[in-house]
Amino acid sequence: MSPQTETKASVGFKAGVKDYKLTYYTPEYETKPTDILAAFRVTPQPGVPPEEAGAAVAAESSTGTWTTVWTDGLTSLDRYKGRCYHIEPVAGEESQFIAYVAYPLDLFEEGSVTNMFTSIVGNVFGFKALRALRLEDLRIPPAYSKTFQGPPHGIQVERDKLNKYGRPLLGCTIKPKLGLSAKNYGRAVYECLRGGLDFTKDDENVNSQPFMRWRDRFLFCAEAIFKSQAETGEIKGHYLNATAGTCEEMIKRAVFARELGVPIVMHDYLTGGFTANTSLAHYCRDNGLLLHIHRAMHAVIDRQKNHGMHFRVLAKALRLSGGDHIHAGTVVGKLEGEREITLGFVDLLRDDFVEKDRSRGIYFTQDWVSLPGVLPVASGGIHVWHMPALTEIFGDDSVLQFGGGTLGHPWGNAPGAVANRVALEACVQARNEGRDLAREGNEIIRAASKWSPELAAACEVWKEIKFEFPAMDTL
C-alpha cells in the first residue's frame, strides 16, 4: 500500500476494540412504529456490566463485530444498528436482567422468517461475554407482518370449509405412531372419524418409512375420509404429514394430497425449517388445502428458562410463516402460572390485537392487522375427564386432540371417538346454558355418561389418571 493510500484509509478511523455500550447502548432512544423489538433475558459472565452485555446482544445481532472496522465509514451505522434501549432486572434473579433491543426494519428481508431469525438469534447465543441468553418476546410491526402471507386460510375460512361452528374441533393422533401397515392405519382413521371426530392425525415422525410408505398411507387415509363422510354426513379430515427430506419431495406429497381431494396436510415446521414451511403454506393457500403444524423439537429450543427462545416467539414466527393449526400445550393439570403464559401465546396465535401484559408473559403490544389467526391445538395426555376444563380454557376456536384418550378406549377406536364427542357436546351445551364448567365439570360428564355407555366406559378407565408435575415454564 502506498503512503498516500494508507493516509486516506486511516482518516477518521481508529483501529482497535472498544466497548459495545459506547455505540449500541442508547437509553435515550425512542422506538419507532416500524422497529422490530426484542426482549432478551440476559445472564452475563461475572464482571460484565448489564449495559455492556445488553449492548453486545444488540451489536452482535445487527451490525457489530468484535473490533472496529474501517468499512463502518462506508455506511450509516446510526441508521442500521440495533440498539439496546432499556434494561430491567428480573425479579428473584440477581444475575439476570431483561434487555430490550430495537432493530431497524431495513435489516430484514421481506417475507422471510428465516432471515429474521438468522439476524436476531443466529449468532449471538454463542457469545462468550454471556453465560446464557433467552429471547422472551418479539414485537413484529405491521410494516413487516404485511410482507407475509401468513396462515393459508385462517380460523373463519376453515370453519366455513368444514361447516362446523360453535364448538371446538375434535382430533386424534393415530397410535401406535410407528409400525402399522398403511391399510391398518387407514382402518384406525376410519373408525375414529366414523365415531364422531372431525380430524385424525399422522404423528410428527410418520413420514415415509419401510413399514408404511407415504403414498400408500395417503391412499388408505383418503378412502377412510370419504367413507366416514358418506356415513356421517359431516366433513372429515386427516392430517397427512407432508414433511420430507427435501422441499421438492414435500411439495410432491402435498400435490398428491390435493389430487386425492383431502382437505388438510401437515408439516413439522421446526425440523422441516421455516423456508420449507413458508413454501408449503403458499402452496396450501393457492390450492385450497388447510395446513396443520406440529412443533416437534420445540422443547430443545424453549424448555430452559434462561437460554433459548420462548415458545411465544416460535408461535409468532409460525403465524408469519404460515399454518392453520399449531400444537400449543394443554394447561390441564399444571400450575396456574403456566396457564396464564399458555393462554398468552394462544391469544397471540388467534387474536388480531393483543395488549402488553407481563402477567401473561407478553412483553409488547402486538397488532397483527389483517394476518389470519391460527387454531391452537391442545394435545398430550388428555381424556374425557379433561373435557370441561379444556372447553373452558381454550374456548370454541381450538382443536382438542385425544390420541390415547380415543384409541385407548376398552371397546375400541369408534367407541373412544363417540365418548369424546358426547363429552364435548355435553360441555358445550352446559356452557351455553350458563353453567360453570370449571366448578361443575365432573358432574356434567357423569350426567352425560348415564345415557352414553361409551362415555361411561371411558370415565371408568381414566378416572384415576393424572399428570401432576411442576411446570417448567413460569414467569
Curated annotation (Swiss-Prot):
Its EC number is 4.1.1.39. This is Ribulose bisphosphate carboxylase large chain. The keyword Nucleotide-binding does not apply. Binds 1 Mg(2+) ion per subunit. RuBisCO catalyzes two reactions: the carboxylation of D-ribulose 1,5-bisphosphate, the primary event in carbon dioxide fixation, as well as the oxidative fragmentation of the pentose substrate in the photorespiration process. Both reactions occur simultaneously and in competition at the same active site. The active site is at K175 (proton acceptor), H294 (proton acceptor). Heterohexadecamer of 8 large chains and 8 small chains; disulfide-linked. The disulfide link is formed within the large subunit homodimers. It comes from the Eukaryota. It comes from Vitis vinifera (Grape). The record marks K334 as: Transition state stabilizer. Residues 1-2 form a propeptide. The modification N6-carboxylysine is found at K201. PANTHER family: RIBULOSE BISPHOSPHATE CARBOXYLASE, RIBULOSE BISPHOSPHATE CARBOXYLASE LARGE CHAIN. Its cofactor is Mg(2+). The modification N-acetylproline is found at P3. GO terms for cellular component: chloroplast. One of its GO terms (biological process) is reductive pentose-phosphate cycle. It catalyses: 2 (2R)-3-phosphoglycerate + 2 H(+) = D-ribulose 1,5-bisphosphate + CO2 + H2O; D-ribulose 1,5-bisphosphate + O2 = 2-phosphoglycolate + (2R)-3-phosphoglycerate + 2 H(+). The basic functional RuBisCO is composed of a large chain homodimer in a 'head-to-tail' conformation. In form I RuBisCO this homodimer is arranged in a barrel-like tetramer with the small subunits forming a tetrameric 'cap' on each end of the 'barrel'. It is found in: Plastid, Chloroplast. Mg(2+) binds at K201, D203, E204. Belongs to the RuBisCO large chain family. Type I subfamily. The modification N6,N6,N6-trimethyllysine is found at K14. The lineage of its organism: Eukaryota, Viridiplantae, Streptophyta, Embryophyta, Tracheophyta.
